[in-house]
């Protein structure tokens, strides 16, 4: 039996703009009742809480990291005007880093995010 986990990835495309894509991660370990991915490296984790009304400016991710929504809702906006909403239990891999040697341009690069709804946003960031 072959199982997969879908990794939603926010990445920097060749034109410098942030975009979304999905990649399957094979769950090749464990037992049929509890399939696991291979162990992945990580560089630590951080917890964050953002109050109702939080909104960031356009920015790029400093280091690639998994973002898990623990409470509240988070909306991510891209330069093309599109957005995605993530709710508790959902996740994405934030890898829209600024290309080496490139100066940040808030009209081209990155994404911005905001808290949605009546509850503070609580997130877990896992580097790696």
Residue spans of the language-model regions?
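A short hydrophobic beta-strand segment most commonly corresponding to one strand
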Residues: 93, 102-128
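Glycine- and acidic-residue-biased ligand/ion/polar-headgroup-sensing regions
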Residues: 62-80, 90
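Short acidic-glycine-tyrosine-enriched beta hairpin
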Residues: 80-98
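Short acidic (Asp/Glu) patches
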Residues: 51-54, 72, 78, 98, ...
């Amino acid at each position: 039996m072959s199982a997969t986990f879908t990794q939603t990835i926010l990445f920097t495309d060749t034109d410098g703009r942030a975009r979304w894509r999905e990649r399957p991660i094979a769950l090749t370990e464990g037992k049929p009742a509890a399939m696991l991915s291979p162990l992945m490296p990580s560089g630590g984790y951080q917890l964050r809480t953002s109050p109702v009304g939080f909104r960031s400016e356009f920015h790029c991710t400093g280091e690639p990291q998994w973002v898990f929504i623990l409470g509240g809702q988070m909306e991510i906006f891209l330069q093309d005007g599109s957005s995605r909403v993530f709710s508790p239990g959902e996740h994405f891999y934030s890898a829209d880093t600024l290309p080496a040697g490139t100066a940040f341009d808030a009209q081209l690069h990155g994404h911005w995010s905001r808290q949605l709804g009546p509850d503070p946003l609580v997130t877990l960031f896992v580097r790696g």
